[in-house]
Amino acid sequence: MKKIAFALALFLALSVAQAAPVRAAQDQIVVVAAENFYGDIARQIGGDRVSVLSVMNNPDQGPHLFETTPGVVRQIAAAQIVILNGANYDSWMDKLLGAGPRRERTVVNASRLVNYKPGDNPHLWYDPATMPAVAVAIADAFAKADSAHAAGYSARLKVTLAALDQITQRVAQLKAKHGGAPITATEPVFGPMARSLGLTMRNERFQLATMNDTEPSARDIAAFENDLKERKVRLLIYNSQVSDRLTERLRDIAKRAKIPVIGVTETMPANVKFQDWVLGELDVLDKALSGPNS
């Protein structure tokens, strides 16, 4: 997996995304989420009973080079509930949790709620089964921290799960429509969703190399380019937050071959709910696979 560089020194500037400090009311639960999509689920369930800081929150900048600030360190130290992806995707959070003073807190680790095994794709939020499990764990944590308002958390959990079920239903529809379609990607970011959709993913060795920040082999690059030039795939997916000369070249080859190209991100856009973000990406994918050039 790509190496994420994190500086824990107290006076190092944040180079990628500046997370605004959480100003919690006296009786609010203080929550810190490593990624903003988990923070969004916490807000949907917690409502005005929680104050949420999402550390990685800028979809316009690459998430693979990240440094933290004293403010973020302090917020994590004060958090009652911490939410992270796990799966070695955000291992910096473990370091921050261990660096501060020990205190009682609940840690919701998505990788421990699903059937994740070392070596599996770490982009767990793109698996439709992940967020419902995370939502239940978050609601349980809120109810334990604030039992007086447990009924409210339970009610909002039901609403959130119903919204997340729209993703499950949409995935089933698209699997019936496009299942088996050969596609490819520059990185495995969308891999869990592609698998759930029943799509046939090609050039996975290339994707693994890019995820691990290593140079793909000449053979794998040639195979990827050939798939595009010979139109052996119906779609190219790329990580729009991270690009280099090689991925840009592959995008250009795909466009010249009139293969649809769509971008996905590892960070959720601002001012949108998780379910709407994912459903929007699924709509874009459906349109691309249904088009005349697919």
Language-model features and meaning:
Residues A5-S15:
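Bacterial N-terminal signal peptides
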Residues I4-A5, A20:
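Residue-level detector of intrinsically disordered/flexible regions characterized by low predicted structural confidence
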